[in-house]
Amino acid sequence: LFPPLFRGCSAPPAAHTALPAPPPPPPTPPAVTVSPGGTIDPQSSTAATQGVVSTVASEAPALSAIPSSALRKYSFTFRQLGALDPLQLRGVDPISGIPFSIPNDEVVTAVKLKLDIAYSPSLITNLSHLKVLINGELAATIPLPKEQAGASVIKEVSIDPRLITDFNRMNLQFIGHYTLECEDPFHSSLWLNISNLSSIEFTVTPLAVQNDLALLPAPFFDRRDGRRLELPFFLPPTASNGMLEAAGIVSSWFGALASYRGAWFPATSGTLPNDDTIVFATNEERPAGVTIPPISGPSLAIGAHPGDSRYKILYVMGRDVKELRTAATALSLGRSTFSGPSATISKLDDLKVRAPYDAPNWIASNRPVKFGELASVEDLNVRGYSPDLVRVNLRLPPDLFGWKSDGIPLHLSYRYSPRPRPDKSTLNINVNRNYITSYPLLAFPRTDAGADAMARFVNKLLPDKLIPAVEDFYLPINQIPARSQLQFHFNFDYPKEGACKDVLLDNVRAAIDQESTVDLSSFPHYIQMPNLSAFANAGYPFTRMADLSETAVIIPDTPGVADISTYLSLMGRMGESTGLPVYGLTVGKAADVQRVGDKDLLLLGGTSNQPLLSQWAGNMPFSASGQIRTFSLSDWILKRMPWYEEPRDDKKPVAKLSAVSLNRDAVLFGFESPLKSGRSVVAIISDKTVGMADVLNALMDSDLVSKIHGSLAIIRGKEVESMTLGNTYYVGSLPPLIALRWFLSGTPWLIAALLLVAAAILGTVMYAFLRRKANKRITGK
């Protein structure tokens, strides 16, 4: 997944896709006090001689060049940069852009652009061409010879590296003409397509970074780098639960920073990875293969990699696991207070007590939320006759209960350039490309000929004056997944003036007002579980509390490297979902499960090292013995009454199915906790290292995530098979009236029985009343 792009793009809406927004600014951290001098060891010379930190003069540069022998090459396709569809350029002067960035610790020495294009055979060669602009500067002009028209052709262009900065925008501008006479600016023969498999290749020289904590999160993470983050964690081979909790806090912080890029945290021990690495150590738990200085408290330090000066090591240390957790929390919440090569945290204020559903990345569900909180002013404005989409990214709690509701109320305020006359211009509204509704873009009100003439005159005098409009409508909640994008397309009809009179004017503007709101406050939180879609897309139910204070991760008794890597990467995924480090998380093993029985549980391991798989086999929709996999099946025929209300998936399992597979696989499944009603367990099980990696890749692949749903998913490489198995249950609460309606909707026989009883009572009462009245008439009393 990639961030929103194509600002000012002239491609039609089919060329745009739903993309999540970059992460919001980090939450305001609690006060972190760094001891004077910011050193780990009072004897700084000792630390320096042991290769952990080295004192750098304050006037030393933050970056310095590494010898040219360290040159590296890498490339991105346009798809990797966010163009999930080909770029389609239409008209005489359309333009489409793609942003890209260069990490701060690299200098670009060469750039090669490889374009896969196709263009109209009707173009006049001498007048038509494709311009490549980097940050507004002309970088190249590509001719469009007639003999190559009408078919895909590869064009390679070298770009001057001096045009490249940290944050860049590459615009591709099509200049097209089909006649030497008067031409229609939007003639159907004016087209050029650019494949999203086109690529841009960089040759870079790495730069050595100064040992300074003030540069964090660089060089371990650079927001300019659009690649997936891969950051090794170096731990003792038998890391304690407390050390793993500290490591989880740090990985969730980096996961939140990585956002749409995704993050993978391979755990290692024994040999220090030849890469930027995070090292965790206490006085009792010191990883072999790296020198750790004496530790005087919760500490952070950054130093050169002992085996390769191109890389850095970040040391997170404490005398015990409590201090280690303090250091990890301070790193994730108070990094702006650090400077120099090392620091000791002398005080960390109490952390804010979190409330359910208060994740920074999630839309507030207790009040209307303004669009200005979700998108910048620039993102809400467009220009031109074929403007880009206005995109507003939404992250909703996945447990919103919208049964029988009108939908999510949306108050939309927008503005647009007045139309010179009534036409077919419209505002089309989609969610994740799914059509919702449309509204006409009207001209000024016209009551008579005089008013019409005056309106035309005002339009000519004030071409930039925008017409305000307000609409209130509902978004169908069943079409709004946890990760969604509102897409507003201003479709302006180009006015035709006649032969040789059409002139393309760039005076059309439109904007969505920042005061527009989306309101979730009317929806209770209530959801049927298990629901792996909620877990895969939003980390639910664990992310209900953004700090994971009601979550425990149960790792194997003897966890392997794959288990720890999976745990760390999952915590990165949780941080990406909420935007907050998981500083409330608990890590335990099978023997600790009773102590954390009142929490939601994330279960990791395999059939050989996770005893809870056999202990809880009767509660799970999945059990394993060797290569035999057993699944509980629900009776799907009886899940609903087709003539009444909506489907309900709360039937008991009626059968079991056994299957034998020798292929590599991983199983992701959920069930209600055997320890406490209403609590959930999500298990990720695989007997092979590659199986755990497949699960993580699936969770970070937008195409595969959409295939994860139900209560069980089997993942084999790039294949995902999901099914609904076992018992279902509900978490959350409903208002009394809605709860009664929901209960009765699942028991139509009870409604029939109540109607019969009511009819019998009413019949009895009426019989008694009429009998008494008849007796009075007979007796004359």
What does each model-found stretch correspond to?
Residues 9-781:
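Solvent-exposed alpha-helical segments and adjacent loops
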